[in-house]
């Protein structure tokens, strides 16, 4: 109990440590792991990787993401299959190059034996806002399930097809599959920006208006879906945007917006943390690895309530929790020191 109290205190102060639910990770592990008694002992720094490691094998991450903003364009195509094949090719190149590098034997052996890949997703909140669907809504939950069920079904068929064409790896002999795992949701911070300033991963926008400070330049972000609504209403003015900036990116003070529009453009701090957990639990059944799941907790939330939320996440089958965000300068500084550039990209 004392250790758990320290964990809760630290997460409230600096957003860490991350939480890894070993039991959920192994309950939701691929069937081949269960059949062969392979255990998942840990994750990566961004907490979305759920792969078995041993004295002989060290897991490697092979990840990429589908842009959910364009879901309607690719849902009935072979885009997921192509991405899976692309990641398989990345594994082949890794095996070829790393085989010649000293002390990489365990990583190469894992890649050869398991060929685990992780197709993720980015732009979830952008998709919802483009359709004027509030994050906290039954419609969002239904679309959430549809998307990840579609991706899972398509990647499973791709794995079967690839096994016939390219062969089964050692661990999957007799299973008719090419990849031990197919899905993992990474943070995708940089990728989301590169793809058109969309929302990152499965996370809500933190603000509708802000200045993004990049390595070589600063970029002013205005939510394009909000800008479209403001333009239609005749309020796409500097005065309106200045007021949004003063409200930390919120639009809840704008009287000319309807309640539905205000709900659509709620920011991460204005969306209940439990809703992000509910949606994560819904999609987890279609994800064989894990999700890099951040929680936004208001600074005045009691430790009892935070504890209850984490217990709820565990009971819902969530495998891990990444950062616990809050309006806290110390957290922002500490997170910057500990980001994983590979996953964040």
Over which residues does each language-model region extend?
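Hydrophobic/aromatic-rich, well-ordered segments within soluble, folded domains that form packed cores
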Residues: 116-134, 305-318
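Function-dense linear segments that define catalytic or interfacial modules
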Residues: 11-111, 121-127, 131, 198-225, ...
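Conserved, charged catalytic cores of large soluble enzymes
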Residues: 1-38, 120-169, 290
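Short, well-ordered loop/turn elements at secondary-structure boundaries
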Residues: 4-7, 12-16, 56-57, 62, ...
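Catalytic alpha/beta core of large soluble enzyme barrels
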Residues: 44-52, 95-99, 183-345
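Internal maturation/activation junctions in enzymes
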Residues: 82-108, 112, 116, 131-188, ...
């Amino acid at each position: 109990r004392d250790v758990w109290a320290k964990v809760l205190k630290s997460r409230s102060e600096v957003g860490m440590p991350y939480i890894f639910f070993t039991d959920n990770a192994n309950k939701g592990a691929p069937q081949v792991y269960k059949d062969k008694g392979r255990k998942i002992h840990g994750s990566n720094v961004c907490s979305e990787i759920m792969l078995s490691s041993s004295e002989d094998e060290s897991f490697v991450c092979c990840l990429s993401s589908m842009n959910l903003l364009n879901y309607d364009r690719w849902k009935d195509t072979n885009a997921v299959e192509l991405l899976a094949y692309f990641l398989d090719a990345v594994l082949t190149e890794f095996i070829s190059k790393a085989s010649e590098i000293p002390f990489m034997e365990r990583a190469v052996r894992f890649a050869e034996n398991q060929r685990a890949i992780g197709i993720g997703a980015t732009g979830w909140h952008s998709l919802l806002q483009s359709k004027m669907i509030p994050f906290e809504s039954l419609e969002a939950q239904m679309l959430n399930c549809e998307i990840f069920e579609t991706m899972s079904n398509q990647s499973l068929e791709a794995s079967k097809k690839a096994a016939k064409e390219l062969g089964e790896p050692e661990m999957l002999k007799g299973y008719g599959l090419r990849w031990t795992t197919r899905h993992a949701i990474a943070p995708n911070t940089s990728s989301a920006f590169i793809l058109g300033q969309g929302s990152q991963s499965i996370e809500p926008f933190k603000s509708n208006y802000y200045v993004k400070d990049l390595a070589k330049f600063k970029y002013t972000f205005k939510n394009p879906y909000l800008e479209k609504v403001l333009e239609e209403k005749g309020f796409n003015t500097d005065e309106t945007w200045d007021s949004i900036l003063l409200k930390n990116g919120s639009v809840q003070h704008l009287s000319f917006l309807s309640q539905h529009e205000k709900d659509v453009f709620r920011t991460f701090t204005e969306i209940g943390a439990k809703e992000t957990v509910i949606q994560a639990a819904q999609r987890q059944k279609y994800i064989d690895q894990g999700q890099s799941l951040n929680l936004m907790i208001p600074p005045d939330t009691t430790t009892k309530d935070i504890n209850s939320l984490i217990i709820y996440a565990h009971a819902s089958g969530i495998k891990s929790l990444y950062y616990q965000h809050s309006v806290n300068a110390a957290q922002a500084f500490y997170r910057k020191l500990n980001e994983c550039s590979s996953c964040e990209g």
